[in-house]
């Protein structure tokens, strides 16, 4: 993919951080400080589908013999590391709110940038090869986005930035991310050139999260005011998002085998979203009340 990949990545690097942010944003603080029920519900909802789909990919990848360690380290499917991160964030809900209420609340904002700098940049300086969980599976890389979402939702911070100013900051940070990406690319480190876990990417993602928050709170995202087709599309996409996430890598592999000529971004992305959505909806209809088992 080369330089093309370096150009494209800044426009998609915010995805995981944004989902983590939204998870924090959708978490309401309990006055009694007890979160057992929400922790149980959230983990129960994802753990069985994760194991089942991991097993499917273990079969496809012919790695049945290593399934047990692979499922614990999200190695059955590379993108499933998000589920491990999500589980860590859910387990940390009580800690998150205790930190927000404490006089040390500002420390929460340093967890992610300091971790990225110490683990990603310093390891490169000393030529230390990183393995699991320091390639992105550890909560410290993403905690800042969850902390931001929980802070905004529960009134711990109040932002006064205009939408125009924030949009300009997002665009400027995208340029900076592209510049840093090409610097790493010219050095010969394609991983750092495209990763979400570099300083410029963290800043861009944080700004995009804040922009999304202002967009939602300002009422700009009102589905009732959107064109009917767009409204239906967004609703279908939202209702089936988890199933699409779990299955779309399998759809990509099948498409690459059957019609390799469509493996060009953004054509492949459009095809994958459409086919994945249809497959998830069909599976939901066929399985009925048991659809939750595979996350559809």
Please annotate each region the language model reported.
Residues 213-238, 249-296:
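C-terminal "closing" transmembrane helix and its immediate cytosolic amphipathic cap
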Residues 140, 157-235:
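Alpha-helical transmembrane segments and terminal signal-anchor/GPI-anchor hydrophobic tails
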Residues 9-18, 29-78, 84-89, 168-169, ...:
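Transmembrane alpha-helical segments and their boundary/interface "anchor" motifs
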